[in-house]
């Protein structure tokens, strides 16, 4: 059956009714969704009464799922442990859905290196895994009251990071590209390699392909404790629905737990991490507003982030956001009247006449900001076999494919990995009936009656 949940995936509210989330990932039958069919201990290798793995990944967001897919290229017994009922239910589901060019990160940082590499990998991944992706280009705009030297600094950073084809353009050319830019905009940094993607479909693609290649996913499974046990780690979990307890054993643990990555790191290491949840609120506008801009419009960045952007989405809507407020609660994904009100005023500095009356939903997400202001990726010095992929805030979505490569290289130094001769590198994405003719839809429903049973939930 069809399933739509704005609570679970706000960005999928972009696709109206029948096209919202055809045969949704969390609601597929076992015949349609092999990932959910793997929830059985009969499939597991046992050792000492525990489920024994070479690698256990904590977190099924875009980073954890990308790592799972990259590892599945090798003969490795791996699993992913996720406390939510589906993949992509944390930071990965509620963000700007941008593939950044890579000009903002400080040269020499992991953010800089991995953003540029991840951006480069997206064309092939989008083709092979059927991920909705478009290189629409991005513009960082400068207004009359701002110092345009800020654009020059971004250009220098981008050149140092290896971002291709960056240039600063003046208002006359800008207005020809984007007629709805604010009258105060004077110039902009243009990055043609910037893009937009559906983060839910991207994460789902990684997870499904990893599953196809043998990685086991355990959903509704909350990690309670992690303890060193000789040459491996013992992971105690609680099933969030049944309340059954289960213990996993793994030679290598990969910590991709988003805003909770510091909690798990601090269970095994004296080198403590501190991750702050940085809340960002968004407004999603109707498809009628989707052509208001064609590029992703950024404002000059600050220490809190890249400002409020205005961007089309791959589904044809318009997205405005985010705010940036540090919060103590790692579950604080509520929206606020003040936050949403501020979006319209702030967006107007770069784009005029944004039709905010056409907002169809609002949502908030949390970014995992680590005190070092960079990604924290690597084996923990005092916890051999425990690998962090922590502090993954923007540009984390863009960097995910490259993070997966980096983490897999670290695993290669810990375990003898051999290529998987049966690796399947392609995957067919979710079929959208709204792209089919009436004749094609009828044929589809005849072959798969599930496509004729539509349920829309607004929980």
Give the location of each predicted region.
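Compositionally biased, intrinsically disordered low-complexity segments enriched in Pro/Arg/Gln/His
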Residues: 17, 34, 44-47
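N-terminal Rossmann-like FAD-binding beta1-loop-alpha1 element of flavoenzymes
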Residues: 53-79
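Flavin-dependent oxidoreductases
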Residues: 66, 226-231, 235-321, 325-336, ...
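Glycine-rich FAD pyrophosphate-binding loop
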Residues: 73-92
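Dinucleotide-binding Rossmann-like beta1-alpha1 core, especially the glycine-rich loop
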Residues: 97-177, 186, 307-308
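C-terminal catalytic lobe of FAD-dependent flavoproteins
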Residues: 305, 314-315, 331-458
């Amino acid at each position: 059956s069809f399933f739509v949940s704005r609570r679970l995936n706000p960005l999928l509210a972009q696709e109206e009714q029948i096209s919202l989330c055809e045969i949704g990932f969390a609601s597929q039958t076992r015949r349609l969704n092999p990932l959910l069919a793997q929830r059985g201990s009969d499939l597991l290798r046992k050792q000492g009464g525990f489920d024994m793995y070479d690698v256990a990944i904590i977190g099924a967001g875009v980073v954890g799922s990308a790592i799972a897919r990259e590892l599945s290229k090798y003969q490795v017994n791996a699993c992913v442990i996720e406390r939510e009922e589906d993949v992509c239910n944390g930071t990965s589901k509620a963000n700007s859905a941008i593939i950044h060019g890579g000009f903002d990160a400080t040269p020499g940082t992991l953010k800089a290196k991995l953003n540029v590499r991840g951006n480069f990998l997206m064309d092939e991944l989008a083709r092979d895994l059927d991920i909705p992706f478009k290189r629409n280009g991005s513009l960082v705009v400068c207004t009359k009251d701002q110092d345009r030297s800020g654009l020059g600094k971004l250009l220098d950073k981008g050149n140092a990071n290896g971002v291709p084809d960056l240039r600063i353009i003046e208002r006359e050319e800008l207005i020809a590209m984007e007629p709805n830019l604010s009258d105060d905009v004077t110039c902009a940094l243009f990055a043609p390699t910037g893009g937009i993607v559906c983060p839910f479909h991207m994460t789902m693609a990684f997870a499904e392909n990893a599953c196809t290649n043998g990685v086991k996913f355990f959903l509704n499974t909350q990690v309670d404790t992690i303890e060193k046990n000789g040459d491996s780690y013992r992971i105690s979990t609680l099933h969030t629905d049944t309340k059954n307890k289960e213990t996993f054993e793994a030679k290598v643990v990969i910590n991709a737990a988003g805003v909770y990555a510091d909690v798990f790191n601090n269970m095994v290491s004296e080198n403590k991490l501190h991750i702050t949840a940085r809340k960002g609120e968004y407004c999603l506008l109707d498809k009628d507003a989707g052509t208001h801009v064609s590029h992703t419009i950024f404002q000059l960045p600050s220490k809190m982030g890249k400002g409020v952007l205005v961007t089309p989405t791959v589904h044809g809507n318009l997205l405005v956001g985010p705010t940036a407020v540090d919060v103590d609660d790692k579950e604080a994904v509520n929206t606020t009247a003040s936050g949403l009100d501020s979006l319209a005023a702030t967006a107007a500095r770069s784009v005029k006449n944004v039709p905010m009356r056409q907002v169809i939903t609002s949502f908030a997400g949390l970014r995992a900001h680590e005190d070092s202001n960079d990604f924290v990726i690597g084996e923990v010095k005092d916890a051999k076999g425990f690998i962090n992929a922590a502090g993954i805030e923007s540009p984390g979505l863009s960097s995910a494919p490259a993070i997966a490569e980096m983490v897999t290289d670290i695993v290669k130094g810990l375990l003898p990995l051999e290529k998987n001769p049966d690796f399947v590198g392609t995957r067919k994405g979710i079929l959208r009936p709204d792209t089919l003719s009436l004749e094609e839809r009828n044929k589809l429903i005849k072959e798969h009656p599930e496509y004729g049973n539509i349920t829309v939930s607004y929980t």
